[in-house]
Amino acid sequence: MSDINVIRAPLLILSILPCVGDDIEVLRRGEGLS
């Protein structure tokens, strides 16, 4: 089980990071507009 988690963790991080980056850009743009 631990081996599977070691493989899944990096994949989850890589799949989540781009979404978080987009959200941060949108928030920054929103703050700039307001």
UniProtKB/Swiss-Prot annotation:
The propeptide segment or segments lie at 1-10, 19-34
* Entry comment describing in which tissues the protein is expressed: Expressed in basidiocarps.
Q: Does the keyword RNA-binding apply?
A: no
> Transport as a keyword?
no
**A molecular-function term among this protein's GO annotations:** toxin activity
Cross-linked residues, Cyclopeptide (Leu-Pro): L11-P18
Q: What are the record keywords, sorted?
A: Toxin
What does its PTM field state? Processed by the macrocyclase-peptidase enzyme POPB to yield a toxic cyclic octapeptide. POPB first removes 10 residues from the N-terminus. Conformational trapping of the remaining peptide forces the enzyme to release this intermediate rather than proceed to macrocyclization. The enzyme rebinds the remaining peptide in a different conformation and catalyzes macrocyclization of the N-terminal 8 residues.
Q: What does this protein do, in the record's words?
A: Probable toxin that belongs to the MSDIN-like toxin family responsible for a large number of food poisoning cases and deaths.
The record's similarity note reads: Belongs to the MSDIN fungal toxin family.
Which named protein is this? MSDIN-like toxin proprotein 3
Lineage of origin = Eukaryota, Fungi, Dikarya, Basidiomycota, Agaricomycotina
